[in-house]
């Protein structure tokens, strides 16, 4: 059985790692290079960086962050936020990223997924999706995709499950499924959404949005059928360590990559 992955998520704003609730009310969580090095030593399986401002004036800061992080860590690094063209992908990969994550740009231009996969390989292309429940209580579950998440989230009218299937057909090699309803709440992932998508696609699905305790990660891997779990606040602010979470999951029968202890 393949090992499951624990992936700290670092949202970067103006060169600092921040974390908010439902994309707002950000708290400073530290220096991205220092945090990345810490997680590398702590047994994280991968790291994800999102440039949450994603404006042109921040782009050079993010490239510099990626370059500095790539010198410090020896685990896969995914970078997203403001990647709108194949040239943007190339710039981040050249800076040291192993994968690039696209979200809004893929909705606006789905061809970007196919173009990126053809040039760099599907293993480099991660599709990140922000989804929100739209069904009324008592009705069948349904989720729609949103873009420009933050202060001005915009509904796309795209069904989350159908969008997931389409982007995989276009060449996305992994999916990050973020629940807008759960993001930053610490109340657990939307496992129904994760399971619905996991059963429809043949690529790894990464759970995002809602981690508050190790039991939530376990539920995402079991009930949500996720291949990996993304988490931020529980790690950034010292609530739990990566090592402690991996030990808990391993004790629950989840196959994990264990970090060798120094002799």
Curated annotation (Swiss-Prot):
InterPro entries reported in the protein's UniProt record: Aldolase_TIM, His_biosynth, HisF, IGPS_HisA/HisF, RibuloseP-bd_barrel
Main localization of the protein described in the UniProt heading: cytoplasm
Coiled coil: none
Description of how the protein assembles with itself and partners: Heterodimer of HisH and HisF.
Gene Ontology MF, one: imidazoleglycerol-phosphate synthase activity
Superkingdom of origin: Bacteria
Primary role: IGPS catalyzes the conversion of PRFAR and glutamine to IGP, AICAR and glutamate. The HisF subunit catalyzes the cyclization activity that produces IGP and AICAR from PRFAR using the ammonia provided by the HisH subunit.
Subcellular location(s) of the protein: Cytoplasm
Biological process according to GO: L-histidine biosynthetic process
Catalytic activity, EC: 4.3.2.10
Protein name: Imidazole glycerol phosphate synthase subunit HisF
Pathway: Amino-acid biosynthesis; L-histidine biosynthesis; L-histidine from 5-phospho-alpha-D-ribose 1-diphosphate: step 5/9
Cited Gene3D superfamilies: Aldolase class I
Keyword Lyase belongs to the record: yes
Active site residues according to the UniProt entry: 11, 130
Catalytic activity: 5-[(5-phospho-1-deoxy-D-ribulos-1-ylimino)methylamino]-1-(5-phospho-beta-D-ribosyl)imidazole-4-carboxamide + L-glutamine = D-erythro-1-(imidazol-4-yl)glycerol 3-phosphate + 5-amino-1-(5-phospho-beta-D-ribosyl)imidazole-4-carboxamide + L-glutamate + H(+)
Family classification: Belongs to the HisA/HisF family.
Record key words, sorted: Amino-acid biosynthesis, Cytoplasm, Histidine biosynthesis, Lyase
Cellular component, GO, one term: cytoplasm
